[in-house]
């Protein structure tokens, strides 16, 4: 996974975004992170990359978008954190070995 530092992508309120396997980070945000926070971000985005591969990339973005819309409409408290893809990534972003043991479609499994 390649990390691209820049000042355009993602939008200013976000630090990192994974677009088709390339991770774009806001330069000033990335430079301010501790080494552990950088590692945690890489694990988080690597989990997203595994999710993308399972759903052939386009499927990931379609489902992510619709789940985000649903989470805004139904329980309007922090839709981003309630998206199944994000829940899995946040739960396991501190586990450096998670991807070695991750089950397919873990974002929808209770035992993730």
What does each model-found stretch correspond to?
Residues 2-21, 27, 55-112:
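Metalloprotease/metallohydrolase-associated module, dominated by Zn2+-dependent proteases
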Residues 32-33:
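Helix-boundary and loop/linker segments of multi-pass membrane transporters
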Residues 40-52, 89:
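Active-site recognition of the HExxH zinc-binding catalytic motif
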């Amino acid at each position: 996974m390649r990390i691209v530092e820049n000042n355009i992508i993602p939008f200013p309120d976000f630090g990192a975004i994974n677009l088709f396997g390339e991770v774009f980070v806001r330069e000033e945000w990335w430079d301010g992170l501790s080494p552990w926070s950088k590692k945690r971000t890489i694990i988080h985005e690597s989990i997203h990359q595994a999710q993308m591969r399972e759903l052939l990339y386009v499927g990931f973005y379609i489902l992510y978008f619709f789940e985000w819309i649903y989470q805004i409409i139904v329980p309007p408290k922090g839709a981003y954190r309630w998206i199944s893809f994000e829940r899995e990534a946040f739960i396991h972003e501190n586990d450096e070995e998670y991807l070695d043991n991750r089950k397919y479609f873990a974002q929808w499994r209770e035992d993730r």
